[in-house]
């Protein structure tokens, strides 16, 4: 009985490791790299609150520039 439990844990561990190694982790990294150029990201961008409104709000808050990055308004210093 103990051998079966150990085998099950080993198989589960290998499945988790294989799944993790085969997943595309660069998909998660890409937005972080692009937003790293911006200092502050806050409200989501929508059809009513777009790039122009975001840039205006950022400049109003005394940031150098701003725009929608991956669906969020991000301001640059």
Curated annotation (Swiss-Prot):
Principal localisation: secreted
Domain of life assignment: Eukaryota
Disulfide topology: 41-75, 45-68, 54-73, 58-74
Annotated signal peptide: 1-25
InterPro entries (UniProt xref): Defensin-like_dom
Alphabetically ordered keywords of this record: Antimicrobial, Disulfide bond, Fungicide, Plant defense, Secreted, Signal
GO terms for cellular component: extracellular region
Family the entry assigns: Belongs to the DEFL family.
Name used for this protein in its record: Putative defensin-like protein 60
The species this protein was found in: Arabidopsis thaliana
């Amino acid at each position: 009985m103990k051998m079966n439990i150990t085998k099950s844990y080993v198989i589960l561990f290998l499945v988790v490791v294989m799944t993790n190694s085969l997943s595309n982790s660069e998909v998660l990294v890409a937005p972080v790299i692009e937003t790293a150029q911006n200092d502050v990201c806050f409200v989501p961008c929508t059809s009513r609150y777009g790039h122009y409104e975001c840039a205006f709000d950022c400049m109003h808050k005394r940031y150098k520039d701003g725009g929608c990055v991956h669906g969020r308004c991000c301001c640059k210093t």
